[in-house]
Design a protein with these regions (language model features):
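Conserved RecA-like P-loop NTPase ATPase core
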Residues: 72, 168, 255
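Rossmann-like AdoMet
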Residues: 1-99, 103-165, 336, 350-395
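A mobile, often basic/glycine-rich helix-loop segment
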Residues: 167-216, 266-276
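Long, Lys/Arg- and hydrophobic-enriched amphipathic alpha-helices
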Residues: 214-395
């Protein structure tokens, strides 16, 4: 992969690499991959998300669904609106809290759609760890608020409030939570971590994985020698924390991933770990630390169990295509575009193709939701009565 980098970028990566190397040395020559990923992405002032860089969109490293089309956010509104209306009906603030809002495109499209529908949202809060992205979010939302004369209060928070009543939203967040890697050797699973050889990061086998940490399918499946995959204790803990702190309302996330049986399929020999840079993906996570985004697919079964551990009302999983179609994305497209005018409708059609096609984002990306005390807001309704979540539950 041919990458042209500035001297500043090279120096940035070198400094972060040195810091990670020092960490490895201080830990006896080996660290879990989750620690490497944490430093590569989030080391203050140096990690991929902590340092300023153009990460999203055409000129960035990857493009998310909100960047493709405002239809994505408009369709999500169909799911959120009944919950927001229920909050207002109970005399509570109608509020959305978004984690990792990227460039702010999703927030903008949601607020624009709510404005078109005549609904005044009380609060739209964002939790964002990237200073660069937070600035871009503020600029975009301030401009939108001025153009539409919005009355919604937008704020940037450091943590999710306890006993939150409202909607929690996260698009492509869980995939960037550090994961642990493991390898199958001689009939046993071992932690697969990071070490150093000639000042280069290398994979190195660690201690055996405790059986209690392994999904049942990894204990009973037939795996080939050298099979590698991931575990997601931090991501599962994050979902569990969301469930604990959501008092009343809805949690909705969209991300790429698989159910457990597909995630740990014996033929998926090298797991799902990828590094992204300027719309290219490679499997070497040690290449230019701090300049590549590191991700792994979400394993949805354990996410669901984490949510259910806090006694949520309902948990739901479907693919992105089914979610968006049930949320009315096709009808919304016809509202804003004229199919008889190919010049204006072709971009809309192209974005729909990418969002819905099984070969693009339609199947790999999933919509995962859970609710808490939804009946308090929407009497005699369940999670599966909300637009977008009325199809087959894949959990």
């Amino acid at each position: 992969m041919d990458i042209t980098l500035t001297s500043l970028e090279m120096e940035h990566s070198r400094l972060l690499g040195n810091k990670i190397a020092t960490e490895i040395t201080s830990q006896g020559g080996w660290i879990p991959f989750s620690r490497y990923m944490e430093m590569a992405l989030y080391e203050p002032g140096m990690g991929y998300y902590s340092a300023g860089a153009h990460k999203l969109g055409v000129g960035g490293d990857f493009t998310t669904a909100p960047e493709l089309s405002p239809l994505f956010g408009a369709a999500i509104v169909s799911t959120l609106l009944p919950v927001l209306q229920g909050l207002k009906a109970q005399g509570l603030p109608s509020q959305i809290l978004e984690f990792g809002a990227g460039t702010g495109k999703l927030a903008q499209s949601i607020l624009s759609r709510l404005n078109d529908l005549g609904f005044v949202l009380d609060r739209y809060d964002i939790i964002e760890i990237s200073p660069d992205l937070a600035q871009r979010q503020q600029e975009g939302l301030n401009k939108l608020a001025s153009e539409l004369n919005l009355r919604t209060k937008c704020s940037w928070l450091n943590t999710l409030p306890n006993n939150f009543k409202g909607v929690i939203l996260a698009n492509e967040v869980i995939d960037a939570i550090p994961c642990d890697t493991l390898i199958y050797q001689n009939g046993f699973w071992y932690w697969y971590g990071v070490s150093l050889a000639a000042n280069t990061f290398i994979w190195k086998v660690g201690k055996p994985v405790e059986q209690a940490s392994l999904p049942e399918c990894l204990l009973t499946g037939n795996f080939s020698e050298g099979y590698t995959t991931e575990l997601h204790p931090q991501a599962n803990a994050w979902v569990r924390q969301m469930a604990k702190q959501l008092d009343t309302g809805l949690f909705l996330t969209l991300d790429y991933g698989f159910p457990e049986s597909e995630y740990y399929h014996p033929q998926r020999m090298e797991g799902t770990l990828l590094a992204h840079h300027r719309h290219h993906a490679i499997q070497d996570p040690f290449h230019l630390p701090g300049l590549f985004d590191l991700t792994s697919h979400v394993e949805w079964a354990h996410s669901a169990r984490s949510a259910l551990a806090d006694n949520d009302d309902d948990v739901f999983l479907t693919n992105q295509a089914a979610f968006l179609l049930d949320a009315g994305i096709g009808e919304i497209a016809l509202e804003i575009g004229d199919p008889s005018n190919p010049k204006t409708f072709l971009p809309i059609s192209n974005s729909l193709q990418k969002l819905l096609s099984e070969a693009e984002m339609g199947e790999l990306f999933k919509a995962f939701a859970f609710s808490k005390q939804l009946d308090d807001l929407l009497p005699r309704q369940t999670l599966e009565d909300l637009p977008g979540l009325r199809g087959r539950n894949r959990l």
